[in-house]
């Protein structure tokens, strides 16, 4: 008997808009050495291969920190830090080159796998590495010579784009050469950040030990503006102690995400390398799974347009069937669309409300208030109310009223008071359904 899964079909359909949206988009992925050493790394590679097959243009930047620490311990070589950056002398550089070369080969081999009965079957991915990044030395700081520790000087964006146009994956590490033919040890997060900026990437994705950025209660912060992310980073830096004075992977990635967004990269994502499928869930679901640092919110509050009617109908139809909202036909919505305000997220209408002015009485009705079930924990109802209050003020109206059967307490929390039918505009009084017995509430003094 064949196994049938409607969940698979549903998930496939829900991800379709994101498949279309991400096709031909450039994504820079930061893979720290911790992610490479984690047992989940094989699944991460499988997911990256899936993104490649879906038409995303992928650049991978890998790090070597834990592998380097292990090798330094084995060789009993000391490589001190200055201001969070490892000082790379000649011997340290040779060890970095050894580890970076080994990881490059290991990652390339993993991406080249095409065994049957595995997610990589038939993938045939071309992995390209090269001298796309030109480095320069950090020099001397406070009398400390960084030796072969360096920074990005130049990036061959044309060369990288040629490889990406051929659907190859570009793989780069923390070692880059200079115009003088020397090698330098770079911070992998800085390499990834500069690549995202100079390639005009659509996304920068960092794999961390945590599932994104957490607040003080340990809850995931789904979305941050750069200014908010900076405040969190400053708080985390203040919590560092002399015994634990180095930035964590999450802090390093967050720092890169802030820089990338400020420089024009639309979205930077921080997700866990321990969570199986985190990359797919972050990119192909409405809410994602980690934290994204965004130039602008992915949610937009705006006036509804005729093209939004389908989304509004999808939102309000379940509430109409439950009797919570009065049924509206498509034709009625087309006539009233100018009255509606919506909150949109990634093309999905997640909340709506309409404003019906009664200028003779100096009042307006707030009607057809609906919020998608997945988004009712936030303050979107308050956002819509404030937007409609502003509109009512523009119309020189002084009162806002609602008719509700289920949300009496919520409206009272917002300052509405319960009144009887006589307080309604005359036209509305004539249309009041006494069988429905909706509660009438008024907000005065807009």
From Swiss-Prot:
Gene: argA
Keywords, ordered alphabetically: Acyltransferase, Amino-acid biosynthesis, Arginine biosynthesis, Cytoplasm, Transferase
A GO cellular component entry from the record: cytoplasm
Entry's Gene Ontology molecular function annotations: L-glutamate N-acetyltransferase activity
Protein name as it appears in the record: Amino-acid acetyltransferase
EC annotation from Swiss-Prot or TrEMBL: 2.3.1.1
Organism of derivation: Aliivibrio fischeri (strain ATCC 700601 / ES114)
Recorded metabolic or biological pathway in which this protein acts: Amino-acid biosynthesis; L-arginine biosynthesis; N(2)-acetyl-L-ornithine from L-glutamate: step 1/4
BP-aspect Gene Ontology terms: L-arginine biosynthetic process
Subcellular localization, as worded in the UniProt entry: Cytoplasm
């Amino acid at each position: 008997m064949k196994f049938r899964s409607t969940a698979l079909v549903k998930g496939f359909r829900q991800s379709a808009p994101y498949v279309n949206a991400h096709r031909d988009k450039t994504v820079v992925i930061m893979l720290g050495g911790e992610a490479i050493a984690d047992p989940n790394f094989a699944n991460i590679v499988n997911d990256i291969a899936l993104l490649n097959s879906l038409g995303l243009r992928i650049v991978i930047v890998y790090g070597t920190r834990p592998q380097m620490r292990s090798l330094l311990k084995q060789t009993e070589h000391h490589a001190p830090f200055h201001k969070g950056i490892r000082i790379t002398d000649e011997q340290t550089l040779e060890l970095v080159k050894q580890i970076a070369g080994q990881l490059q080969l290991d990652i390339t081999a993993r991406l080249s796998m095409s065994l049957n009965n595995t997610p990589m079957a038939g993938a045939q991915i071309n992995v390209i590495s090269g001298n796309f990044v030109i480095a320069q030395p950090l020099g001397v700081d406070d009398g400390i010579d960084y030796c072969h520790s360096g920074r990005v000087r130049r990036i061959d964006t044309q060369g990288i784009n040629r490889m990406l146009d051929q659907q190859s994956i570009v793989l780069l590490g923390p070692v880059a050469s200079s115009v003088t033919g020397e090698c330098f040890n770079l911070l992998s997060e800085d390499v990834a950040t500069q690549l995202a900026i100079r390639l005009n990437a659509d996304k920068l994705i960092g794999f961390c030990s945590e599932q994104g950025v957490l607040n003080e209660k340990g809850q995931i912060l789904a979305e941050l503006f750069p200014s908010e992310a900076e405040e969190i980073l400053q708080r985390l830096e203040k919590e560092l102690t002399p015994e634990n004075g180095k930035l964590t992977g999450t802090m390093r990635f967050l720092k890169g995400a802030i820089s990338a967004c400020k420089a024009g990269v639309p979205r930077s994502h921080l997700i866990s390398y321990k969570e199986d499928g985190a990359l797919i869930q972050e990119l192909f679901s409405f809410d994602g799974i980690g934290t994204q640092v965004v130039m602008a919110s992915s949610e937009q509050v705006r006036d509804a347009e005729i093209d939004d009617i389908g989304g509004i109908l999808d939102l309000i139809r379940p509430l109409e069937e439950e009797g919570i909202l009065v049924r509206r036909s498509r034709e009625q919505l087309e006539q009233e669309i100018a009255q509606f305000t919506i909150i949109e997220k990634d093309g999905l209408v997640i909340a709506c409300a309409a404003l019906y002015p009664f200028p003779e009485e100096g009042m307006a009705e707030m009607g057809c208030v609906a919020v998608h079930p997945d988004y009712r924990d936030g303050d979107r109802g308050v956002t819509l109310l404030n937007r409609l209050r502003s509109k009512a003020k523009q119309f020189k109206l002084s009162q806002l009223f609602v008719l509700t059967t289920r949300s009496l307490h919520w409206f009272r929390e917002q300052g509405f008071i319960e009144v009887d039918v006589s307080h309604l505009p005359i036209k509305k009084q004539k249309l009041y359904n006494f069988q429905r017995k909706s509660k009438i509430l008024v907000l005065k003094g807009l």
